[in-house]
Regions:
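Small beta-barrel nucleic-acid-binding modules, primarily SNase/OB-fold domains
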Residues: 2, 8-159
C-alpha cells in the first residue's frame, strides 16, 4: 500500500510539472501576424503563434454590420506591429488567451471601444473605464453607433 501511495505522489508531481510547462506566459511581446476578426489576433512570440482574444470587449461578428470595419480598424492599429500582451493568464473556451494588447503604448482594446468598433463586454468585465469609453462612443455617434439599432454580438450569435 505504501508503494502505491509513493508511486501516486511521484506521478502526480511529474504531471504538475508538465502542466506548468504548457502554460502561456501572462505578459509577453510579439509580432501581430494575423487579425482573425476585430477581437481575435494571432501573435508570434518565440517562434510560436499564440491566439489572443481581447479582454473587456466584444466586436461585431464578421457577418454582422461593422464586423469588417472592426477588423480593418484593428489591422490598421496593429497588423505587422510589435505588440505587448498583458493577461491574467485566463483562456476562453476556445483556448485563446484573454488579454489587453498594446501597440506603441496604445491599448488596442480601448481604441476599438472608443472608436465605436466594439461593445464593452459586460458579461465578462465590470471595468468602468471600458463602460465610460462605450458611453462616450455612443454619445459621439461613432462607428457602429451610427446604426439606428446596433445589435450586440452576443445577441447576433443567438440567431
Amino acid at each position: 500500500m505504501k508503494k502505491l501511495i509513493y508511486l501516486f505522489l511521484i506521478l502526480a508531481s511529474c504531471n504538475s510539472k508538465n502542466n506548468d510547462s504548457k502554460k502561456l506566459p501572462t505578459n509577453f511581446e510579439g509580432k501581430v501576424v494575423a487579425i482573425k476578426d476585430g477581437d481575435t489576433y494571432k501573435i508570434m512570440c518565440d517562434g510560436k503563434e499564440r491566439t489572443i482574444r481581447l479582454s473587456h470587449i466584444d466586436c461585431p461578428e464578421k457577418s454582422q454590420p461593422f464586423g469588417k470595419n472592426a477588423k480593418h480598424f484593428a489591422s490598421y492599429l496593429c497588423f505587422g506591429q510589435i505588440a505587448k500582451v498583458v493577461s491574467e493568464g485566463k483562456t476562453d473556451r476556445y483556448k485563446r488567451l484573454i488579454a489587453e494588447v498594446y501597440v506603441n503604448d496604445i491599448c488596442v482594446n480601448k481604441e476599438l471601444v472608443k472608436n465605436g468598433f466594439a461593445w464593452h463586454f459586460i458579461k465578462y468585465s465590470d471595468n468602468e473605464e471600458y463602460a465610460d469609453l462605450e458611453k462616450q462612443a455612443r454619445q459621439n455617434i461613432v462607428g457602429l453607433w451610427t446604426d439606428v439599432e446596433p445589435i450586440a454580438p452576443w445577441e447576433w450569435r443567438k440567431k
